[in-house]
Structure formats: C-alpha cells, structure tokens
C-alpha cells in the first residue's frame, strides 16, 4: 500500500551568471545552505530526515562526485540517512523529486529531501594524459563543461535538440511561441507578487 506524499517546503538559490559572484563558491557549500534552509522551512528537525536525493549533471569540485552524501552531512542530516545521486541530462531536478517521492510512497522513507545544483562556472579542465605521462606530442586541456552541453552520441549541443525535433515531428512555431509567452507571463506574475522572492534563500 502506497503512502500519501506531501511537499512540506521548497527553496532555491538565486540564479547566478556564468563567471559571476557565485563562481568561487563550491557547489556542495551552496547546496548545503539551501538544504538547511529547506529543513528549517519544513518545520521538522534535520535529524527527522532519512533520505536525500541529489542531482548534478556536471560535478565541479572534488567533493561533488558523491554530492548526495556530502551535502547531506554538511546540512546536518543523520549519518545513517540514505543518500542517492541522480545523473540525468535535462529534467534531473524533477527526477530527484520523483525518486524522493518513490522512497516515501513505498514506505522506505518518512521524510525525504530532493535537491540539485549546477555550478557551470566551476567546471574544470582536464589533462587526460597526465596520470601516466605524455611521451610525445601536445598535451591538451579538455573543457569538461563542453561535455555537459553535448550529446555523447551525436556530439551535438543539447540546445540543437529543439531544431531536430521540429524537423522530425513537424512542430509549428506559433504554438511554441504561445507556450513560451505563457511561461514568461507566469514568471513575471511570480516575481511581481513576491512568490518567487519568498522561495529564494539569500
């Protein structure tokens, strides 16, 4: 028998610019501040939570490869709480929410947190030949951010997907523009009413 699921709180950080004021802040630090704020807003104690689902598609710091555990510990969640990392390109935040909901629905968790973060400003460069030495030729720095944007199969940028789908399925521009306008109008209404501002942790 599945359990009823309720959302107790929601919070987000401010959106930063690429190379902006947040560029020197490790992703797990920013994420843990947001999770702590979410716990506080929920009215529950950090010790009450038994699971954290965390998603990031582009690990940017040495402690972000298992971000769920690191963020959970930095946020004051119990050491024996579950920690699950989700890696899904596009809609990963929604996938984290679904995974946390499944934990509760199946009775495996009582209180769970779904969280995620991307810090593209901190994406590293890699020298893949440096570990065993470069016998000859040039060493090349690989921009790991580039691989966060590209499809690993076609090597196309994921932003090109819209054009590809339009060509394949014959989508028309007008309905998409209407949908985009509706989204912008909703965003403006959320900003003007203060709803969005109340969600942001300074």
Predicted feature locations:
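Short glycine-rich or small-residue beta-strand-to-loop segments that form or flank ligand, phosphate
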Residues: 52-56
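Acyl-thioester C-C bond-transforming condensing/cleaving domain
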Residues: 2-3, 17-48, 58-67, 72-202
């Amino acid at each position: 028998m599945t359990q009823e699921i309720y959302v107790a709180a929601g919070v987000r950080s401010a959106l930063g610019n690429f190379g902006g004021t947040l560029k020197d802040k490790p992703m797990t630090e920013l994420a843990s501040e947001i999770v702590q704020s979410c716990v506080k807003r929920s009215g529950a104690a950090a010790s009450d939570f038994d699971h954290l689902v965390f998603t990031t598609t582009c690990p940017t710091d040495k402690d972000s490869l298992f971000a769920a555990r690191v963020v959970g510990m930095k946020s004051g969640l119990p050491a024996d709480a579950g920690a699950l990392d989700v890696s899904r390109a596009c809609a990963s935040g929604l996938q984290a929410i679904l995974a946390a909901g499944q934990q509760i629905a199946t009775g495996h968790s009582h209180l769970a947190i779904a969280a995620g973060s991307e810090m593209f400003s901190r994406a590293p460069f890699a020298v893949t030949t440096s570990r065993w030495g470069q016998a000859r030729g040039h060493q090349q720095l690989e921009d790991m951010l580039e691989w966060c944007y590209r499809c690993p199969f076609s090597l196309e940028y994921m932003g090109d997907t819209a054009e590809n789908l339009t060509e394949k399925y014959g989508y028309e521009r007008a309905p998409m523009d209407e949908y985009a306008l509706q989204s912008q109008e909703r965003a403006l209404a959320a900003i003007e009413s203060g709803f969005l501002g109340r969600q942001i942790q300074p």
